[in-house]
Amino acid sequence: TDEEMLAIKENGGVMGISPWAPLIWKKEKGCRPDVKDYVDHVDYVVNLIGIDHVSFGADNTLDGNKDDKGTADQAVLYPAVVGAYNSCVGTRSDERHAKGFEGCWQLENVMDEMKRRGYSEEDIAKLTGKNLLRVLRANWN
């Protein structure tokens, strides 16, 4: 919720934004979300809590392995979020993340979209690790 995100900001934390498709899916669009939809989500959170409190939260494997069991588990664990998405888009594990950001190897697609929207190199550096490092260093003395 917005309140939870504001609490993260108030406590100096960082929120990782996931490309998990059911979270960023725009129902009216009727199709699997893409990189632009993901960056729309990033924009919303950055506008709410500020660039210093946002990071990428890829939530997928580095090697691109598909997790069909995890996909099935999601439908059971989060029926309100996943049910409508599955009905419209499908249940294949390769449809679980935004098109063009299926894994960390495609982070460049996200960075390119952010540059198109006017994010600076420093903003992108914060989102790709600088913010997380700041919080980890502050807490892992």
Regions of interest found by a model, annotated:
Residues S18-P19, I49-Q74, Y78-G100:
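Short acidic/histidine-rich active-site segments
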Residues L23, T61, G129:
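Positions that flank functional sites
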